[in-house]
């Protein structure tokens, strides 16, 4: 078996957009971050951006359905491809240098698997914490969770919520007066629903807009620099966020820019 490292690396870099492509629910925000080219490198960069945003944002961000479908399909295909190549190498009496390319590819796959796992763990942690809030959101806006969660996350959320509510009822609530048995009471001095900390300060980087796509939200500040304007209700002021700049702002002030892919959290 003659292994050509150039052919192997070409397989890893080949654009496999068509693999595992599945329609995403309406409102999927994947294309807002990168809609120009669904290449392997672009998808990895977008995945890392989603990962960073999810780790910093106080709320659960929309699940990137289309992006994750492509990434997971490529990951499974490359793992299978690597196992096939490894089997062929082990059957040959070659020197150690022949195994080096396979070790490099395995390291790259482990790096990708780390990002995917970390992203999903972060999301599951928020689902656990904001279960009652998600329940309230689903009741207020039917269908909202279809965009916010993946199919697997939706199953996890429903089962986790059912188990938690059953535990609360059996251990505590059934022994209390009827007027105190609600787990989603918001009328008292302290709300029983744990919502995201909307006013938390976050660091953000203002992204440069695509050169071939005019942005109606983009303005020019007093120094002639392109910028986005945000309103700070507490101060009653409008602040210009220059493109390429790094700022610290309250999350609720820049949330819309984040959802539109104008800024990234750092």
UniProtKB/Swiss-Prot annotation:
Keyword Transferase: no
Subcellular compartments: Nucleus
Pfam families: Sld5, SLD5_C
Sequence intervals crossing the membrane: none
Keywords: Chromosome partition, DNA replication, Nucleus
Main location class: nucleus
A single BP term in Gene Ontology: chromosome segregation
GO cellular component: CMG complex; GINS complex; nuclear replication fork
Segments forming a coiled coil: none
Stated family: Belongs to the GINS4/SLD5 family.
Subunit structure: Component of the GINS complex which is a heterotetramer of SLD5, PSF1, PSF2 and PSF3.
PANTHER family the record matches: DNA REPLICATION COMPLEX GINS PROTEIN SLD5, SLD5 PROTEIN
Function (record text): The GINS complex plays an essential role in the initiation of DNA replication. Has a role in chromosome segregation.
Protein name in UniProt: DNA replication complex GINS protein SLD5
Originating organism: Eremothecium gossypii (strain ATCC 10895 / CBS 109.51 / FGSC 9923 / NRRL Y-1056) (Yeast)
Gene: SLD5
